[in-house]
């Protein structure tokens, strides 16, 4: 079970976007990286194609999983993730507040 999943609210811990929050768009577990909306935005020169014109576009670049942390559901500060058995389901729990992260 992954600690960070698509749709999670995360906080950037290091780098040029330190302290910014965003939603995880995609997780790449083999590369240990994730795409976060509005974080690590880069400009790319796009070549013209049949359905897209040329120009400079901005898009999110991936960020290493060690540089982001889940935002605590209670106060929005970064927290570590633990696991707990709730009935017959395994759920993610914020170590900071003890709140369940999963729905």
Curated annotation (Swiss-Prot):
Pfam family, one: ribosomal_L24
Keywords annotated in UniProt: Ribonucleoprotein, Ribosomal protein, RNA-binding, rRNA-binding
SUPFAM superfamilies xrefs: Translation proteins SH3-like domain (SSF50104)
GO cellular component terms given for this protein: ribonucleoprotein complex; ribosome
GO terms under biological process: translation
Molecular function terms, GO-annotated: rRNA binding; structural constituent of ribosome
PANTHER family attached to this UniProt entry: MITOCHONDRIAL RIBOSOMAL PROTEIN L24 (PTHR12903)
Self-association state and partner proteins as the record states: Part of the 50S ribosomal subunit.
Similarity annotation: Belongs to the universal ribosomal protein uL24 family.
Function text: One of two assembly initiator proteins, it binds directly to the 5'-end of the 23S rRNA, where it nucleates assembly of the 50S subunit.
Stored HAMAP family: Ribosomal_uL24_B (MF_01326_B)
Protein name according to UniProt: Large ribosomal subunit protein uL24
Species, as recorded: Rhizobium meliloti (strain 1021)
């Amino acid at each position: 079970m992954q600690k960070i999943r698509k749709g999670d609210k995360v906080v950037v811990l290091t780098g040029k976007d330190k302290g910014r929050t965003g939603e995880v768009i995609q997780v790449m577990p083999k590369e240990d990286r994730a795409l976060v909306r509005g974080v690590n935005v880069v400009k790319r020169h796009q070549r013209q194609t049949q359905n897209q014109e040329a120009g400079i576009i901005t898009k999110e670049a991936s960020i290493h999983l060690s540089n982001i942390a889940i935002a605590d559901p209670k106060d929005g500060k970064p927290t570590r993730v633990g696991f707990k058995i709730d009935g017959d389901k395994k759920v993610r729990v914020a170590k900071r507040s003890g709140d369940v992260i999963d729905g």
